[in-house]
């Protein structure tokens, strides 16, 4: 299953925010530059993650962004469910005339569930714990 760029960069942003010392704020600009993505795209991603409670945004002169909850409470499968469309194929009868007899939809649904079940075992903290190489890369970029 391939994730959209929106979800890919959303997960990267959460990992980056999780790598910061607790309570430290950063800016969308810093996250944008870290991952070489357009600012407009990252603003949309951060807004969605904020709506879902994964990112806290603080406005004003001393404002910025940080994780909205502890990294060990942000389950990757939940993040994907919240921001990814997750429609593997379009099985509406008006788009596919074999839908009434097709078994592919069921197989794909099981595969999608297995994908999410695996990601439900991992948190943002899991991506950071004992991963000094990642932390070095995030600081160096």
UniProtKB/Swiss-Prot annotation:
Residues 28-51 bind DNA. Binds 1 [2Fe-2S] cluster per subunit. Disulfide bonds: none annotated. Residues 2-129 form the HTH rrf2-type domain. Its cofactor is [2Fe-2S] cluster. Keywords: 2Fe-2S, DNA-binding, Iron, Iron-sulfur, Metal-binding, Repressor, Transcription, Transcription regulation. GO terms for molecular function: 2 iron, 2 sulfur cluster binding; DNA-binding transcription repressor activity; iron ion binding; transcription cis-regulatory region binding. One of its GO terms (cellular component) is cytosol. This is HTH-type transcriptional repressor NsrR.
């Amino acid at each position: 299953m391939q994730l959209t760029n929106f979800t890919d960069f959303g997960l990267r942003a959460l990992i980056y925010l999780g790598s910061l010392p607790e309570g430290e704020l950063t800016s969308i600009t810093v996250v944008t530059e870290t991952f070489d993505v357009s600012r407009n795209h990252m603003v949309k991603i951060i807004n969605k993650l904020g709506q879902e409670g994964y990112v806290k945004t603080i406005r004003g002169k001393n404002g910025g962004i940080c994780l909205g909850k502890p990294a060990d409470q942000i389950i990757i499968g939940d993040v994907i469910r919240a921001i990814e469309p997750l429609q593997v194929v379009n099985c509406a009868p008006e788009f596919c005339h074999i839908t009434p007899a097709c078994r592919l939809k069921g197989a794909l649904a099981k595969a999608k569930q297995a994908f999410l079940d695996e990601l439900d075992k991992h948190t943002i903290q899991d991506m950071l714990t004992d991963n000094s190489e990642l932390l070095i890369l995030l600081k160096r970029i």
